[in-house]
A protein has these predicted regions:
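Active-site-adjacent loops and short helices of periplasmic peptidoglycan-processing enzymes
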Residues: 7, 29-196, 212
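Domain-terminus/edge residues, biased toward the C-terminal soluble/receptor-binding domains
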Residues: 161-162, 173-411
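Bacterial N-terminal signal peptides
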Residues: 15-24
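Bacterial N-terminal signal peptides that target proteins for export
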Residues: 2-16
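Residues embedded in well-ordered secondary-structure elements
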Residues: 18, 34-36, 83, 237, ...
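Intrinsic-disorder/low-complexity regions
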Residues: 9, 28, 48, 398-400, ...
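Bacterial Sec-dependent signal peptides at the C-terminal "C-region" and cleavage site
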Residues: 23-32, 366
Length: 411
């Protein structure tokens, strides 16, 4: 090929697929054999990474079941969303209705006709699982509990909870009230991610309200057994059995386990502990790409600049079996040609991360800067180069930065 033809070919820097090699910053150990998940007694369960949402183990996790007081995770989620929107404040004084006072089951022991700070009611919902507190919060936010249930269901739809329907704020039994282990795990992950300050309530081990002589203890006994556990919620009714969603954070990795329909308190605790131990022992999570990190610099036709940097709009994390990080591969998928004008944030292509041909993550590649369309004569010059490139040029891979990731500490 002549030097002039080669120069033209060098202008064709966009490709259908440019391979990206993943390299760890430290040497990875040999891949481990991941055994089957532990034996779990609960009717359904799930174990997932709380950040990547990768499912590590599950059985019948999408089955709709009575959630009992796991319902209150959504009750507190709705309250946290209303707080974030500025429609309510923690200092608001909430009137206690007859309905709230008379609600059966576990109680915070609020009294009819009094007013209680919203901050205290939310502790009553989260820490002591008070049905009375849940109704009071629901009525204050939505005017009536059934209207609050509508809000809960709208949030459930927005979060993609496909096996969930609420009819009350407390989780008291109702044939039309149900959820699944998977939905409860996703809800908990969203609560932790979106409202971290509110989530801190779930780590509190006790709450003493008013004239109650002794503080009531958090029913999540794993808060005492495992220092890495920082929430989330228990549930119990005759129809639901013993339920538990638990989250633990170790060395920057967060796992969430949900069990529903266990036959005893000790069984649900043991099931959750086994799932967490399995997840932390056999899986690891890595940061692959940072928010805004340039992953490629493809050629742009008809622009005032020749290239545009592209990246993703989030930090991309991947959960894999221990020792398999080096087996990951990533592919950047770009169109054959990219034309100006381009606005910052425009979708230009995708990056796809795979392990053993299974897609683990796929994210849009967005332009990191604007590319303005060039003038008339410059565009005509590009027309000529595109024509000549079609005759003599050959495509080349787009430039791409190599991601790095630190090996997680032993857990």
């Amino acid at each position: 090929m002549s030097s002039s033809a080669s120069a033209i070919g060098d202008r064709f820097r966009t490709v259908a697929a440019a391979a990206v090699v993943l390299a760890a910053a430290t040497v990875q150990g040999a891949p481990e054999i991941v055994p089957d998940p532990p034996s779990i007694s609960a009717k359904s369960y799930i174990l997932m990474d709380g950040t990547t949402r990768t499912v590590l183990a599950e059985r019948d996790s999408g089955e709709p079941l009575p959630p009992a007081s796991l319902t209150k995770i959504m009750t507190s989620y709705v309250a946290a969303a209303e707080l974030a929107a500025g429609r309510i404040t923690l200092d608001d004084q909430v009137p206690i209705s007859v309905k709230a006072w008379r609600t059966s089951g576990s109680k915070m022991f609020v009294r009819e006709g009094t007013e209680v700070a919203l901050s205290e009611l939310l502790r009553g919902v989260v820490i002591v699982s008070g049905n009375d507190a849940s109704v009071a919060v629901a009525e204050y936010i939505a005017g009536a509990e059934d209207a609050f249930a509508d809000m809960m269901n709208r949030h459930a739809k927005d979060l993609g909870l496909t096996s969930t329907r609420f009819v009350n704020s407390s989780g008291l039994p109702d044939d039309g009230h149900y959820s699944s282990a998977k939905d409860m795990a996703i809800l908990s992950a969203e609560l932790i991610e979106r409202f971290p300050e509110h989530y801190r309530l779930y780590a509190e081990k006790s709450f003493q309200y008013g004239e109650i002589e002794r503080p009531q203890l958090n029913r999540n006994r794993l808060l005492w057994r495992d220092k890495s556990v920082d929430g989330v919620k228990t549930g119990l009714t005759e129809a639901a059995g013993y339920c538990l969603v638990v989250s633990a954070l170790r060395e920057g990795t967060r796992l969430i386990a949900a069990v529903m329909g266990a036959t005893s308190d000790e069984d649900r605790l043991r099931d959750a502990q086994k799932l967490l131990a399995y997840g932390f022992r056999y899986f690891e999570t890595h940061d692959l790409y940072d928010h805004g990190e340039p992953l490629a610099n493809p050629w742009v036709w008809y622009g005032t600049v020749e290239n545009v940097a592209v990246g993703i709009d989030e930090t991309l994390r991947i959960t894999v079996p221990r020792g398999r990080y080096d087996d990951l591969s990533a592919v950047i998928d770009l169109p054959d040609e990219i034309m100006a004008p381009i606005a910052a944030g425009d979708r230009v292509g995708v990056v796809r991360v795979t392990l053993d041909d299974e897609i683990l993550a796929e994210r849009d590649l967005l332009a990191r800067s604007e590319v303005v369309e060039s003038g008339f004569f410059a565009r005509r010059g590009d027309d000529i180069e595109r024509f000549m490139g079609g005759l003599f040029g050959d495509s080349a891979e787009a430039d791409a930065n190599v991601p790095s990731a630190e090996a997680p500490a032993d857990q």
